């Protein structure tokens, strides 16, 4: 929209994007939120999240909030720690995570939004809140074999399973403190990979974390 793009249905009638999705049969939306996306245009800030959620609520669509716990994209190849949390201890970072989660969710609650689902982390097969060497655009730098260099492994599921589970448990409790009825989710990619799910959910379970879905 900010670039002037417009959306049309099959009859050539102009529609707002979320309204068009509703018209096409969608009944739920999933919106990400980053910690400080100011270096990336400000998209997916809590303010941007609210605007999108308000559009969905007005159309009676269910809402999922996707916490990346990063300033930009988080995925299996990179889960870069937010710049403002860099250098913090494990205990400090749990406080950062809880404060960010509660701040965003209270902002939604104060504006009449209640998510049906909340993701604690995005594509967390390797955990979250760990960093890799990245270029100036935030993309991971890979060697000739396609491997990345981990520069901070605090929340890495394989390197530090207890801390990964501790971060997830902190996020779960923070979500429930604001929205006790929301469904708090583990979000993993590759739904066909049973070994991945057994490993990751096993790490969480064996280290005291819990989830709803």
Predicted regions and their residues:
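Short, well-ordered alpha-helical scaffold segments within catalytic/effector domains
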Residues: 14, 98, 165, 197-198
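Conserved acidic functional residues
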Residues: 1, 66, 213
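Secreted glycan hydrolases and related glycan-binding modules that recognize and/or cleave
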Residues: 1, 98, 103-104, 204-206
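Substrate-binding cleft and catalytic face of glycoside hydrolase catalytic domains
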Residues: 19-183, 189-191
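Charged helix-capping and loop-helix junction motifs
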Residues: 13, 44-49, 198-201
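Boundary/entry segment of secreted carbohydrate-active catalytic domains
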Residues: 1-20
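Surface-exposed beta-strand edges and their flanking turn/coil or helix-capping segments
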Residues: 3-6, 78, 199
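Substrate-binding cleft/loops of secretory-pathway carbohydrate-active enzymes
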Residues: 185-213
């Amino acid at each position: 929209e900010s670039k002037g793009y417009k959306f049309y249905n099959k009859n050539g009638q102009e529609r707002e994007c979320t309204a068009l999705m509703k018209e096409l049969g969608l009944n739920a939306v999933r919106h990400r939120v980053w910690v400080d996306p100011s270096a990336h245009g400000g998209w997916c800030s809590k303010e941007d999240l609210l605007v999108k959620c308000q559009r969905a609520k007005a159309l009676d669509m269910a809402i999922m909030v996707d916490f990346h716990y990063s300033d930009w994209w988080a995925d299996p190849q990179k889960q870069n720690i937010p710049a403002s949390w860099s250098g913090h201890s494990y205990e400090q970072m749990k406080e950062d995570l809880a404060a960010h989660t509660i701040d965003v969710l209270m902002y939604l609650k104060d504006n009449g939004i209640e998510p049906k689902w909340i993701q604690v982390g995005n594509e967390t097969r390797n955990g979250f809140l760990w960093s890799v060497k990245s270029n100036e655009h935030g993309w991971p730098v890979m060697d000739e074999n396609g491997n990345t260099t981990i520069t901070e492994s605090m929340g890495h599921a394989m390197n530090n399973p207890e801390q990964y589970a501790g971060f997830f448990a902190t996020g779960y409790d923070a979500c429930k403190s604001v929205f006790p009825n929301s469904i708090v989710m583990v979000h993993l990619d590759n739904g066909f990979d049973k070994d991945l799910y057994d490993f990751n959910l096993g790490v969480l379970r064996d280290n005291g974390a819990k989830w709803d879905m």
